Swiss-Prot record:
InterPro entries: Beta_tubulin, Tub_FtsZ_C, Tubulin, Tubulin/FtsZ-like_C, Tubulin/FtsZ_2-layer-sand-dom, Tubulin/FtsZ_GTPase_sf, Tubulin_C, Tubulin_CS. GO terms for cellular component: cytoplasm; microtubule. This is Tubulin beta-2 chain. It is found in: Cytoplasm, Cytoskeleton. GO terms for biological process: microtubule-based process. The keyword Protein transport does not apply. Keywords: Cytoplasm, Cytoskeleton, GTP-binding, Magnesium, Metal-binding, Microtubule, Nucleotide-binding. Tubulin is the major constituent of microtubules, a cylinder consisting of laterally associated linear protofilaments composed of alpha- and beta-tubulin heterodimers. Microtubules grow by the addition of GTP-tubulin dimers to the microtubule end, where a stabilizing cap forms. Below the cap, tubulin dimers are in GDP-bound state, owing to GTPase activity of alpha-tubulin. Its cofactor is Mg(2+). Its main location: cytoplasm. The keyword Nucleotide-binding applies. GO terms for molecular function: GTP binding; GTPase activity; metal ion binding; structural constituent of cytoskeleton.
């Protein structure tokens, strides 16, 4: 039986990345743009029910995404409706308005978003009612704007209230340190992080700077556009969900993934990586061994987040290998990597790297691997954000845009101190040793 996931894509970035994700998902499951099965391997659709609802009124079965598309502007969703995937989504799963959130978190969370949230929740409920064993939700959004960040945060808190025992996971696109879209990004993203810490079980962090580097350095794209970057995010999203969508032996659902990756509930921010990324011109000359694939996964160049794992320690990680890879090889190469870099892995969590295999490779590649890592170097991201936030907040810059929407200055202070706490928790576990952890556990008992 498929344990279903409801996908929610919020805001401009969420819907554009969502489109790339669904396109790749269709290709992997042998479905065409209208959701009709065109493949020849029954394994392709054995567990397609995780993300798709099957509709067979009369004639062949159509696979419809279990998805909700939300935006406070209608432009991106209209393009989705009239684009190649126009026949794919159910028309009643779109929710748009024309008010816009103007890159203002408070508009998305308090004013515009709060007026519309009930209508959005109705669509989500309808999708949930049509499932047999809902495992949880995944949200695709960016943290720098108004809709994905503000309305996305509001939606998460409502889902947490209404479905307290279901997994909430997000693919959250953080503002890039060097590529700024709007001046108030530091406010929007810190207010969102504050919400994600409390209302989410798994947050997979992605930032545009790291994506841009991969596109330029590795893929040799001269001036990458969002379409190129979204393609990279979709690769990782499909890779991460492999063990949910195809028969496999480990991390078969979101909760198991969470149990293996999140040792402390607040520290659920994960770094994704993918291998191999390579220049399409050189692909015919490349075939990586399993140990090369493994070391690429833990290499800064293959991370979709601009942080350096050498400055932190891995609490946990999950590696997913796709294609013809034997479990013996995969587990051996991960063990060797841990042995060689033992200082980068905490020693007080035994067996902290899980390995799962999927025999179905990504479309157009003989093999690939993806990893999700919970590393203390994630604090770099939050520090960077906090510093930019503090610079503006100290001068009370642009604060009137937020207080004008009914927000209290106290909320900014709370978000700041919650993020400071998060950073010091990461630091504490980075420096912890086996003895300290054992003492802590005994103390708690």
């Amino acid at each position: 039986m498929s344990r279903e996931i409801v996908n929610i894509q919020a805001g401009q970035a969420g819907n554009q990345v969502g489109e790339a994700f669904w396109r790749m998902l269709l290709a992997e499951h042998g479905l065409d743009d209208a959701g009709m099965y065109k493949g020849n391997d029954p394994q392709q659709i054995a567990r397609a029910g995780v993300y798709f609802t099957q509709v067979d009124s009369s004639g062949p079965t159509k696979y419809v995404p279990r998805s909700v598309q939300v935006d406070l502007e209608s432009g991106v969703c209209n393009r989705l409706r009239s684009g190649p995937l126009g026949q794919l989504f159910r028309p009643d799963t779109y929710f748009t308005s024309d008010s816009g959130a103007g890159n203002n978190w408070a508009k998305g969370y308090y004013t515009e978003g709060a007026e519309l949230i009930d209508g959005i929740l109705d669509i989500v409920r309808r999708q949930c009612e049509a499932t047999e064993a809902l495992q949880g939700f995944q949200m695709i959004h960016s943290l720098g704007g108004g809709t994905g960040a503000g309305l996305g945060s509001l939606l998460l808190s409502k889902l947490r209230e209404e479905y307290p025992d279901r997994m909430l996971s997000t693919f959250s696109i953080l503002p890039a340190p060097n590529v700024s879209e709007t001046v108030v990004e530091p406010y929007n993203s810190l207010l969102s992080i504050h919400q994600l810490v409390d209302n989410c079980d798994l947050t997979i962090c992605i930032d545009n700077e790291a994506l841009y580097d991969i596109a330029v350095r590795t893929l040799k794209i001269k001036s990458p556009g969002y379409k190129d970057l979204n393609q990279l995010i979709a690769k990782v999203m499909c890779g991460v969900s492999t063990s949910l969508r195809f028969p496999g032996q480990l991390n078969g659902d979101l909760r198991k993934l969470g149990m293996n990756l999140v040792p402390f509930p607040r520290l659920h921010f994960l770094m994704p990586s993918f291998a191999p990324f390579y220049d399409p011109k050189a692909r015919t000359f490349q075939r990586l061994s399993v140990s090369e694939l493994t070391s690429s996964l833990f290499d800064k160049k293959n991370l979709l987040v601009a942080s350096d794992p050498r400055f932190g320690r891995y609490l946990t990680a999950a590696c997913i290998f796709r294609g013809k890879v034997s479990s013996h090889e995969a587990e051996n190469s991960v063990m060797q990597l841990q042995r060689k870099n033992s200082n980068l892995f905490v020693e007080w969590i035994p067996d902290n790297v899980s390995v799962s295999l999927c025999s179905v490779p990504p479309v157009g590649q003989p093999q690939a691997a993806v990893a999700l890592a919970n590393s203390t170097c994630m604090q770099e991201l939050f520090k960077r954000n906090l510093d930019q936030f503090a610079l503006m907040f100290k001068r009370r810059a642009f604060l009137h845009w937020y207080t004008g929407e009914g927000m209290d200055v106290m909320e900014f202070t709370e978000a700041e101190s919650n993020t400071q706490d998060l950073i010091s928790e990461y630091q504490q576990y980075q420096e912890a040793t086996v003895e300290e952890e054992e003492a802590d556990i005994e103390g708690e008992q």
